[in-house]
Amino acid sequence: MCAVIGAILLEPTKQDFAMLRRVFLESKIRGMHATGMSFLPKWSDKIEIIKEPIPAHEFIFKHLHDDNLKDMVAEDGNLYMIGHCRYSTSDLEYNQPMFYNEKSIVHNGVITQELPENWKDIYGYDCITKNDSELVLHSNDPLREFSHMSMGVVELHQDRRIRFYRNGKRPLYLSSISNGCIITSTADIAIRSEIPGIPVEVLMNHYITFDNELAMMIEKVDVENAKDLQHYELC
């Protein structure tokens, strides 16, 4: 169990920065072994990544004060960020976010139980880590390709887009605000973070993308026999 975070904030204010810190702080309940983030800074058109084996409250104190966050605002005046709070079940070298080919991701879930040395033969990807989230990073269509496994994912793209999605085995929520959107793993994280508005559950097996003008694109993925276990009820 981990927490994933996503944010696009147009011309963010100090109040927005405080809200973002609350999101990281409230997300740590789902993982305290490591915290990380990716963002598009004003000094570069490349994605920057910071991740450390520390809980979110220490990460916030070290990296998310207002002066640092101002520098994380992109050249267009907007903030594009994804984050991760990790509950570790293996080596801390597997911390997130991850980056490949102008895309960074944070992932909550399990993609494979196969040994890493077999991934190339099974999935066709040359992975440089033993973190199975890297398979999602390489895939262009993970909802179809790994439909049998579990995922709640937020992607940050260098062209100032955020894409997010889940299958029926992991939760994910979207909160729309006046100047942007916030993605959290659960509704209660959004509520405790005092994000304005009501968190809405992300539709299962849909790719949802926001661009730098908050234009939204939704792509439905047809997956045979898909079930949303977030709403599973015992008979």
Name these PLM-found stretches:
Residues M1-C235:
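Conserved short alpha-helical segments that host acidic/polar catalytic motifs at enzyme active sites
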